[in-house]
């Protein structure tokens, strides 16, 4: 499901805050890291590899977005925040996932504020099997 309506985004953030009263309110309000569009990806609970399929879908969304100049980020925390309490159940119902499906991943989309150079990588962390 794609959510780009700011009012709906705020409703979801408010539900996260209500479901986690001990969480810093700013953290709850920032759970989507400022992304103006969120894609909520659901998995088929009856298929044990469906989470991998969701990951591949998220990757394709992110690569496609980047090809059009749109930044993206894969977020797991909102999944936990939305599924570990009863206060968020109305939000999940509003997303309207089919019977037998559950929220698996969130992908935030938007135009990046910055484009830093890639950090140096340590090639020694890669192990080649001969």
What would you call each of these model-derived segments?
Residues 1-130:
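Acidic, surface-exposed loops and disordered segments
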